[in-house]
């Protein structure tokens, strides 16, 4: 599983844009840092794809969850041991079940 291709869904891009805009209202530098951290985390997933946690209490879908900085939840899926798809980047304040 070392040669996974990264795919980021349009919903995940939209999630990150919303998060960035929200943070940037108070601190543009912090917003940029947060975006860099998300992308660094995606790179970590490519090296360690099973680092996330399955949560059957959240969803029946075969996805993994990974918390970033306590307030953000990355939802991703490994497809055919070839692709790592970032599905969503949510805040922990959102109703995760309804967002999936």
What are the functions of these language-model segments?
Residues 50-80:
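Basic/aromatic recognition patch in beta-strand/loop cores that engages polyanionic ligands
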Residues 1-58:
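Basic, Lys/Arg-enriched alpha-helical interface segments
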Residues 17-20, 67, 88:
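A cross-family signal for key residues in well-ordered alpha-helices
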Residues 5, 55, 62, 94, ...:
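Solvent-exposed, flexible loop/coil residues
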Residues 2, 61-62, 82-85:
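Residue-level signal for beta-strand positions within conserved beta-sheet cores that form or flank
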Residues 71-73, 77-100:
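Enriched for short, Lys/Arg-rich terminal
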Residues 25-28, 64, 85, 93-95:
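Short, low-complexity, polar/charged sequence segments that are solvent-exposed and flexible
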Residues 25-26, 36-39, 68-74, 82:
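Short charge-dense sequence patches
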């Amino acid at each position: 599983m070392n040669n996974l291709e990264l795919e980021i869904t349009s919903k995940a891009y939209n999630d990150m844009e919303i998060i960035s805009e929200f943070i940037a209202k108070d601190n543009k530098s912090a917003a940029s840092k947060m975006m860099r951290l998300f992308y660094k985390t995606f790179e970590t997933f490519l090296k360690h794809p099973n680092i996330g946690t399955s949560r059957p209490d959240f969803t029946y879908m075969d996805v993994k969850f990974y918390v970033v900085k306590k307030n953000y939840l990355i939802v991703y899926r490994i497809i055919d041991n070839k692709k790592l798809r970032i599905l969503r980047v949510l805040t922990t304040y959102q109703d995760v079940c309804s967002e999936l």
